[in-house]
Amino acid sequence: MSGEGIPFPRVMSLAVHELRTPVTVVTGYLRMVLREQAGPLTDKQRKMLEEADRSCVRIGALVAEMSELGRLESNEVALARANFDLAALIVELASGMHEGHDRDVRLDVRGANQPIMVTGDRVRLSAAIGALMHAALRERGDPGTIVVECSALTHTTPPWAVVAIGDEPTLKALGDAAGATPPPFDEWRGGLGLVLPIGRRVIEAHGGALWSAVGDAPRAGSALRLPLATS
């Protein structure tokens, strides 16, 4: 992707550089005012300023995501390489996931009772998979269950660790796609920032793949595969 012949990573780097300072300045002044360094505030003023501060925090997080995406596109990110249990990571992420509780949407983990060892950057893969879980819970409109199903595909070369995330009806098709060339991933969605584009690039940097459910509702589920650890 490029704009007017300028490489996409450079565009991202320039945007981050231009945005970071004003966001930091505005956030700093808002917090000075909230601490009443310029005088006392009414309840109404405090409420408005707190809302503005939350918005600045979100913009700051988006700027950080832009920086990370640009670095991934430029291959400037050094990934850690260590063996870890992917199944245990899935259980850990699910236990801390609270999105959807207020709408009676719950998360059910399956297939994580046995270790599934992979090699890679546990911190970055944790963020990527956590973002996929959060997106699945956030985008489900009705009460129900989102399933996270872990499995190992050992008859392929290379053998894969597979994680499918979605409604019950989508899981089989998501898992079946792991053994061949999987369909594309729908990463550009409003309201989720850049965590999904970042997640896809992190997974692919580990030699894996990420894809969406096929058909009329590609956002109904997603799945990923990572090479199983060889030692």
Predicted regions and their residues:
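Conserved catalytic submotifs in the C-terminal HATPase_c
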Residues: 46, 80-83, 106-116, 123, ...
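A conserved beta-strand-to-alpha-helix junction within the catalytic ATP-binding
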Residues: 80-95, 126
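Glycine-rich/acidic phosphate-handling loop/turn and adjacent ATP-lid/helix
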Residues: 159-193
